[in-house]
Amino acid sequence: MEAYVLSLSDVLFNILFIGVCILSVLLLISHALKYIIGDSKEKKLFNQRLEQIKNQQPLEPTKYQDIQTICKTLKESYSTNALRHLDARKEVLYCLYRMVLDNKQAISNAIREDLHRDVGMCVAEVNSVIHEINFLRKNLNKYLKRKQVPTVCAQLFGKSFVEREPYGCVCVISPWNFPANLSLIPCAGALACGNTVFLKMSKYSMATSKLIAELCDKYIPSEYLRCEYLTGREAIQECCSASFDYYFFTGSTYVGKLINQAAAEKMVPATLELGGKNPAIVDKSVNLKVAAKRIAWAKSINAGQICVCVDHVFVPRSIKNEFCEAVKNSFIKFFGEDQKKSEDFGRIITKSAAKKMKEIIDQSDVYYGGEVDIENKYVQPTILQNVKIDDLCMKEEIFGPILPVIEYDTLDEVFEMVKQHPNPLACYVFTEDNDMFEHVIANINSGAIYNNDSIVHLLNPNLPFGGNCQSGIGCYHGKYTFDTFSRPRAVCNGHTSFDLSLKDWPFTSFQSWAVDRMAASEIPVVSYL
């Protein structure tokens, strides 16, 4: 039997392969040990903190008249530098993580009580908070540690760094439609960056707002985070007049403008997460049943009360009826023939909002649905046809389970109609033609653009979530949360052991020549000296 002789290259390859495998295993073990040890340390500190908080008297629910005083207290807490070090921030994030994890079911039940939303979506909202907090904990060092950058010749033998600096006391104003996600994720981001936080939650999601305020009082030291949930407009007015260092607002464009004006008067930054009339554009090349199902699903989440929901849809004229029928069948498949009896279909938040939905339906050509029960805040999933750009349903964001279907012949028609409500928070395209998708990208300015699905881009922490102009200012989620709640600060470390006289007066012809040569040579950088 002839022996097989390995060549030198085979031997080297095998050695390299085995070495890489061993190194990978060691790295995995190292990361696991680091996480376990770090988690154990945070857990120990959390238990100590919990014991301290248990001995404290429960705080009285915050009243809007107290906001000015609380803002002052939180600013004083920030000035002590208690959250200056990353370890202190990790401890607070772990407290927040445990708060949500330990009370996951209670928070889910409160959301369901407020919004009549299906159980799965309530749990998914709480899980999204847990995942985001874990992302922040895991990447705190990566994104917030001081980083060295190259140094220019003028700083010869010095060192240059960029560090992320917190703003101070952050005011987070959250809405009712996703009361856990849209309040706790911004709070987690602000705390991760070293800020103290005042959280103004919505009175319309009273069960969730009250529970989260009570849990924050129990789990998070009051010098870092305080909540208010009892009032609406009065509290927002107080927030605008208080001396916060940063505003983070999610809600309507009208209130967003008030927040932005207040921030501008104080010369402090603001992030505004607003909304808009998000279009969907369906192309003939797509699987129509799949596209219709995904649009119907988006329109059904929280009964259409989500800022990234499909607001209206553009469909080629030749397939309009087929598309409408497919959307109708999807609604029936999701919630049955009588959607009012479904435990999974949500309710409109207030009677006045349900009344507004009825006015839209009454002035439209209904293809399917149209039932409204104002007393029970129920609006049936509804499809509108023969829609014109000046109809009531196209005046402003619908924020409900009503889907206007607009026929088109060319994409240029679509682009002209979208210009009536520019810069939507999201634009959804359904096509198998990549050239068509790129054409839409080039012609519609939006916070996000997604082909062949909707909304689920929010689950990706590697993508920014935010609008543009009318749909918002700024973004967050994942690494972008660190960018939002902290600012880059230049840090330069020089010395006196060597003095470069080229910059001193009187300025000689030699200095002019030397400086000119340095500029002309295009080598102004000295890396990491």
Curated annotation (Swiss-Prot):
Gene Ontology annotations of biological process type: aldehyde metabolic process
Family matches, as InterPro entries: Ald_DH/histidinol_DH, Ald_DH_C, Ald_DH_CS_GLU, Ald_DH_N, Aldehyde_DH_dom, Aldehyde_DH_NAD(P)
EC number: 1.2.1.3
MF terms in GO: aldehyde dehydrogenase (NAD+) activity
One Pfam entry name: Aldedh
Keyword list, A-Z: NAD, Oxidoreductase
Signal peptide bounds: none
Catalytic activity: an aldehyde + NAD(+) + H2O = a carboxylate + NADH + 2 H(+)
Catalytic machinery residues: E273, C307
Record-listed NAD(+) binding positions: G251, S252, T253, Y254, V255, G256
Record flagged with keyword Nucleotide-binding: no
GO cellular-component term (any): cytoplasm
Stated family: Belongs to the aldehyde dehydrogenase family.
Protein name (Swiss-Prot/TrEMBL): Aldehyde dehydrogenase 1
Organism for this UniProt entry: Entamoeba histolytica (strain ATCC 30459 / HM-1:IMSS / ABRM)
